[in-house]
Amino acid sequence: MNVLIIDNFDSFTFNLYQYIGEILRAERAPFNVIVKRNNALILADIDTIAPERIIISPGPGAPDDPAYFGICSDVIQTWGKHTPLLGVCLGMQGIAHVFGGKVGRARVPMHGKTSPLWHDGAGVYRGLPQGVDIMRYHSLAVEATSLPDCLTVTSLVHDTHGTTNAHDFASVVQNMAENVEIMGIRHREYPIQGVQFHPESFATEGAKVMLKNFLFGH
């Protein structure tokens, strides 16, 4: 399996590289994990790499600024239509931006803090219990009211911890209370997923489960 990680100049990128390598090595199948900076790629290079999975890393800045997001928007628009793609933190914000969503200041900036996660049990969350702790490093967030119809909310954090099953999760998503922050999105048609938190952090519970689901869940 060829996996391309596009690095948005973030220190967490190496963690992603390490985790992905460990997961694939355990499967005892041939693999190649390639890391490229977002300003060191053109689309023709990706054609040559021929990735079977693409991960867009965290990073500083905002997704509407090419100085920070580089080629990533073009990759989402082109390769994301047919190749499973996971956006992490800035990567998720970029997915929302590309499809017409807005990214603004987070309700509460979170840097190096954990929160319990509530999710839909599908995609990267398959087999993951509700309420797992996830590590957050972000001051920007996807604005819930701006999310286009082509994207669905797959996970969130909120101040009251009563959500314990998919039915309740769906109700919270439908109402999108003010104390809710979107932590995950998925495209309804294309194999594109995004997570606002850091699955590559040691403090995120079930991190390798999520990444393995991304790698082999298609």
Roles of regions detected by a PLM:
Residues 51-133, 211:
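Cysteine-nucleophile active-site neighborhood
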Residues 29-41:
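A short beta-strand-loop structural module common to alpha/beta enzyme folds
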Residues 1-4:
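Extreme N-terminal starter segment of soluble prokaryotic enzymes
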Residues 19-30:
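A short, Lys/Arg-enriched amphipathic alpha-helix followed by its capping loop at the start of a domain
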Residues 201-218:
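Acyltransferase
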Residues 38, 46, 50-54, 199:
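Proline-aspartate-enriched helix->loop->beta-strand connector
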Residues 33-35, 103, 153:
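Generic structural signal for residues in well-ordered beta-strands
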Residues 123-189:
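Catalytic beta-strand/loop cores that center a nucleophilic Ser/Cys/Thr
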